[in-house]
Amino acid sequence: MFPVFCPFLAPFKGSVARSTNFWCMTIFCLCNTTHRSHSNSDSTGLLYAEAMSLPTIWVFGDQLNRGIGALATATPLTHRVLFIESAAKISSQKWHIQRAHFIVASMRKFAHELRSAGFQVDYRMVKSMGQGIKEHVREFAPSEIVATEPNSYASRLLAHDLGVRTVSSNQFLCHPSEYQGFLGARKSIKMEDFYRWQRKRLNVLMDGSEPTGDRWNFDDENRQPPPKTGHDRWPVPALYELDEVDEQVLAAVQSHCFGKLPVGQWATTREGALERLQFFIERVLPVFGEHEDAMLKSNWHLAHSLLSPYLNNGLLLPREVVEAAQSAFREGKVPLNSAEGFIRQIIGWREYIWNCYWQWMPDYAHMNALGADVKLPPMFTNPSKTSMACMKSVLDGVNERSYSHHIERLMVLGNFALIAGVNPQQLTRWMWNSYIDAAEWVMVPNVIGMSQYADGGML
């Protein structure tokens, strides 16, 4: 049995949608800082009774930010915190150790941040999420359980089944209800149309009613090959030193995972994520644009932001990332093609994929329009099994750091799987297990639609 240090939750049966995203779920109940007391004093007893009836805020492990949804208005005096780590999910399959470490360590450190801010945290390590909820309710008897809208279809089903009240999420820049306004009576949808609508609606890179620079898109300037010289052109982010929490998490998950151990490439705190954002804006974004579609065997990151893990687990919010990029352009620190190309990835493609997921789930996850039924080749889990240099290079990188940039995912891994007829659900599952920034809402549309054409052209 997997140690209870991992937050992997029992999977639902029957669909990709109902068996993913739960492992990264956490539950928080922000709590009153008044210590539980057994005093016979009437005043103490009243305080204890009031504390016991406080509402619970349920926060998922991909919502690790005080500014998201239900947490945004919570204080130590108004809510209680429950943090659950469950062993049920991880025991069913293997995950990349850097992915497991990133999720677990980020959650533990977020819990520490809440404690430091004055919140009392009921941190439970149990076999299942249901057990954790039952134990928490038995001890604290919350007046209600409320959650920010979960980020996966299965998690929303779970919240509904448990009678949890949900509040609207601000973790994305276009809520599905707003997306319906974009769809309107459109007979067809294109990401570019959505992107322009977003630019206007959010007033990003706009001069009045016109796009800054009189162009919406600078793609023709952003497809240059990498330079043949000057490998130091690509800024290298500093490594973080692993702390005691990191070591404890690694000791707990190592025997149940695959891949190379982390070396400090990925931050696991809000502070670290903000440092990564600052590094990207100051050092990397100025050279991002023209080479954003390039690949190099000798350099795994080039000018990519490496911010997707933090955006996808909540340590960073898209609005602050977009504002930082736009400000850098307005201050003359980065060229327009770099700012526009990066911002398009955030408010365009990312938000578009997010809303397509909610528009088409749950059936979308099972689509296989081409009838692809080839099993995932062994090289995906053991790169030494292939003599194809391009595949081995990318797969070695995934094994080493739980990451490859989007061009490698689409143009190398995705193209191979499409040509070989690999089952799209197996490919989705492998990516979900392997990538540090994996989320069902992004993996399903990108694999089923963008990469494998398993949706028959819907995306």
Label every PLM stretch briefly.
Residues P225-S402, L418-I419, W430-A454:
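Catalytic cores of enzymes that engage adenine nucleotides and/or redox cofactors via long glycine-rich
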Residues M52-D122:
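N-terminal beta-strand-loop-alpha-helix module at the start
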Residues D122-G130:
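Short beta->alpha junction loops
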Residues C6, C24, C29-C31:
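Cysteine-centered motifs
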Residues M129-W266:
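Beta-rich, aromatic/charged-enriched effector core domains that present basic-aromatic interfaces
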Residues N21, N32-D42:
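Intrinsic-disorder-associated, low-complexity terminal segments enriched in Asp/Asn/His/Tyr and depleted
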Residues V4, A10, V16-A17, D42, ...:
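Acidic, Ala/Val/Gly-enriched low-complexity intrinsically disordered segments
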Residues L413-A417:
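Alpha-helical support elements that line or immediately flank enzyme active sites
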